Amino acid sequence: MTGRRTVSLHVGPVGLCGVDEAGRGPLAGPVVAAAVMLDPKRPIKGLRDSKKLTPAARERLADEIRARALAWCVAEASVAEIDRLNILHATMLAMQRAVAGMSHAPDDVWVDGDRCPEWTWRSQAVVQGDDKVAAIAAASILAKTVRDELMRGLHEAYPLYGFAQHMGYATAAHLAALKANGACPHHRRSFAPVRLLLDQTSLF
């Protein structure tokens, strides 16, 4: 089934860079973006939207992408930048950093979603691109695996919040931990559940 899905993904023009992000929705941690230029001479089987892959498959494919891609780069925007800029602009900043950090300059940049950052590269937005375009799928896999590893690191530093289980998303367990322990330095103060909690605690 994976092989059939891979064949259906659009390869795109030569010199195409695919871009995707991970971590727009969570209450904690950075937003991570990845940019990938695939090598048509070294195809990678099994590429698809990272959310539709098992963790083991994501890790295996991430290793293949790093080994076989013409170029790739992963970048992030910090929690402080998210709170200062808002999550949309911070995501665009992370994407800009990822493309700018690649060792090869792309001819075209295709971005997952409905908008592109303001930059000089020729680009287009592709809605659900991580399930349509191979390079965007590869970028989604790198962004997801890198961010998950970052959140596991935060779990070691702040085990009370369970970051390794929910990766910062607003699960019932995470919200309960926030209520019991307050916010840590890696929580996004601009996000409503965190902000409301801080507002409530400041009243007492």
From Swiss-Prot:
PROSITE patterns attached to this UniProt entry: RNASE_H_2 (PS51975)
An annotated GO cellular component: cytoplasm
Reaction equation(s) it catalyzes: Endonucleolytic cleavage to 5'-phosphomonoester
GO BP: DNA replication, removal of RNA primer; mismatch repair
Cofactor note as given: Manganese or magnesium. Binds 1 divalent metal ion per monomer in the absence of substrate. May bind a second metal ion after substrate binding.
Residue ranges of coiled coil: none
Chief site of localization: cytoplasm
The protein's required cofactors: Mn(2+); Mg(2+)
Sequence positions that bind a divalent metal cation: 20-21, 112
GO molecular function: manganese ion binding; RNA binding; RNA-DNA hybrid ribonuclease activity
Ranges of residues in domain RNase H type-2: 14-203
Leading EC class: hydrolase
NCBIfam families in UniProt: PRK00015.1-3 (NF000595), PRK00015.1-4 (NF000596)
Entry-linked HAMAP family: RNase_HII_B
Family membership noted in the UniProt record: Belongs to the RNase HII family.
Identification of the protein by name: Ribonuclease HII
Native source organism of the sequence: Thiobacillus denitrificans (strain ATCC 25259 / T1)
Lineage: Bacteria, Pseudomonadati, Pseudomonadota, Betaproteobacteria, Nitrosomonadales
Gene name tied to this protein: rnhB
